């Protein structure tokens, strides 16, 4: 493993396999993928982890409904996730499954460490449990139904509003209550541990309200990782699932290679999660790590839900199959293509908040940004270059001060502005920086009128200057859009005969103005973003 570069370790949640992957799981994964691609281009040695959460009562129930064993069911689901990630150009370096031997070994090692820590004890759990959410609730946290579609007085999950199960069983408990002050100190000393900031406020408020010890083993079913020192118990699904992040970088493996990887990779720089699992990642997970003396992840970024507008009420609603308003990833791919899909969800939906989506808005963004602006710039510029310079780019100007050069002025400092936005996962803001250059280049065409310059032999140098600047703007924009749209950006570079640049890991260096060689063949090609509608 090359450790000459700084490590950047980013993760998605590992996804439940009770159903096929949907827009929400794809959303989390593309957020992480864009960051991973960006960090590779900026010189980091990236490890990008995703995977499947295969244990727990919810998965066992889904398997039973399909007439399969839990292992058969999870084996049947894995290809659905891998196929969608491949289709969406996800560049993960690892795909972990919690049924793998490496996870079993790591979880059993965790149990031994927890036992040694003194933060584990055996007791009896008597309370409420939500199978769909895989979450325990106290009597004060639950609600009682007065809705017509539930039995009156029935205990409902405060998160998903489905009926709860009453659970009474012997269990091992993790002393989560012992970490209230330690967690609050963490939030004080590292205010960016949870992002966006308003999510940190939610987490802090929850912890300030007091923490109960957490039941971390189950005895009422057997689909899980066995507790090594008590064969009648299996591991609570979240106690298992959260550890996957460390399992993937060698936790608990007693070899020099594994220890070196763990030292290099851990802690993770970013956990990307949905807001519905923020307490597990920002309360339980850091407390677990504190208990066993391991470093904490640097940032947990919690994105919002994808919502759709109810045609009758006009209100935004969370997508769900039960409401009949769910949109399948393939529906969006069929409309926008993969690159348009990635672009829309990463730039028009603000990651930290809930985002209302619609096919009308998708078409509007695609046509305005990709077809009319970016795609149009590529087509017009390459067409003029080929037409006026015999299928090639013009020679590189001897001086960039010979004529007015508005594009070079915008490009000055562009990479730094873009990187600041990308570092903060503000993909919409980063896109705006690039689109400023693209819009300026389109205006530059209208203002400089290359077609008129081409008719005047005395303007040959100015024509070459204008076309070169347009091609150079395309080259730089392609590099900056690469994390969002890897295939079309690489294709834009190929049409400029700059395909070797696509693998660059020096983003600042490669985006310096004036690196286009000049004189090389260029290709207009088919439109990269055909207009919709």
List PLM regions with ranges.
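Cys/His-rich short segments
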Residues: 117-180, 184
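Generic structural concept
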Residues: 371, 375, 408, 412, ...
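A glycine-rich phosphate-binding loop feature that marks nucleotide/adenosyl-phosphate handling sites
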Residues: 128-133, 304-308, 361, 394-402, ...
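Structured secondary-structure scaffolds
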Residues: 2-50, 102-106, 156-387, 432-434
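Basic, alpha-helical terminal appendages of large translation-related enzymes
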Residues: 1-7, 51, 123-128, 132, ...
């Amino acid at each position: 493993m090359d450790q000459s570069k700084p490590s950047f370790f980013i993760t998605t949640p590992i996804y439940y396999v009770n159903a096929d992957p949907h827009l929400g799981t794809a959303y989390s994964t593309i957020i992480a993928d864009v960051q991973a691609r960006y960090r590779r281009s900026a010189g980091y040695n990236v490890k990008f982890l995703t995977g499947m959460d295969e244990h727990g009562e919810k998965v066992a129930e889904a398997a039973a409904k399909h007439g399969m064993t839990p292992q058969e069911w999870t084996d049947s689901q894995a290809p659905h996730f891998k196929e969608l990630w491949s289709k969406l150009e996800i560049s993960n370096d690892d795909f972990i499954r919690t049924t793998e031997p490496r996870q079993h070994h790591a979880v059993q090692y965790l149990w031994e460490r927890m036992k040694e820590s003194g933060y584990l004890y055996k007791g009896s759990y008597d309370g409420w449990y939500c199978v769909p959410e895989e979450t325990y609730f106290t009597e004060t946290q639950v609600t009682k139904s007065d809705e017509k579609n539930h039995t009156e007085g029935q205990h409902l999950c405060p998160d998903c509003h489905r009926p709860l199960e009453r659970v009474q069983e012997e269990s091992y408990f993790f002393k989560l209550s012992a970490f209230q002050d330690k967690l609050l100190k963490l939030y004080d000393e590292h205010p960016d541990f949870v992002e966006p900031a308003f999510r940190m406020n939610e987490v802090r408020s929850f912890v300030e309200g007091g923490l109960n010890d957490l039941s971390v083993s189950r005895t009422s079913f057997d689909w899980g990782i066995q507790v090594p020192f008590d064969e009648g118990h299996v591991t609570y699904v979240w106690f298992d699932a959260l550890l996957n992040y460390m399992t993937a970088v060698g936790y608990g493996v007693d070899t020099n290679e594994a220890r070196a990887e763990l030292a290099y990779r851990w802690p993770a720089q970013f956990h990307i999660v949905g807001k519905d699992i923020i307490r597990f990642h920002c309360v339980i997970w850091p407390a677990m790590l504190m208990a066993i003396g391991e470093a904490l992840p640097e940032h947990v970024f919690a994105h919002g839900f994808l919502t759709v507008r109810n045609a009758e009420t006009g209100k935004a609603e969370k997508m769900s199959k039960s409401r009949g308003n769910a949109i399948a990833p393939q529906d969006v791919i069929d409309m926008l293509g993969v690159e348009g899909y990635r672009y829309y969800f990463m730039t028009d939906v603000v990651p930290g908040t809930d985002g209302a989506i619609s096919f009308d808005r998708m078409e509007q963004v695609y046509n305005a940004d990709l077809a009319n602006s970016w795609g149009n710039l590529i087509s017009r510029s390459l067409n003029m270059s080929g037409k006026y310079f015999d299928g090639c780019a013009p020679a590189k100007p001897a001086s960039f001060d010979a004529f007015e050069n508005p594009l070079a002025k915008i490009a000055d400092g562009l990479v730094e502005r873009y990187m600041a936005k990308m570092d903060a996962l503000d993909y919409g803001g980063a896109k705006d920086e690039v689109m400023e250059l693209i819009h300026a280049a389109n205006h530059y065409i209208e203002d400089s009128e290359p077609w008129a310059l081409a008719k005047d032999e005395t303007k040959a140098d100015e024509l070459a200057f204008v076309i070169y600047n347009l091609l150079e703007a395309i080259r730089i924009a392609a590099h900056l859009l690469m994390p969002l749209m890897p295939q079309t950006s690489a294709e834009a570079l190929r049409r400029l005969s700059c395909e070797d640049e696509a693998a660059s890991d020096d983003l600042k260096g490669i985006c310096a103005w004036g690196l286009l060689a000049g004189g090389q063949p260029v290709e207009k090609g088919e439109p990269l973003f055909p207009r919709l509608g």
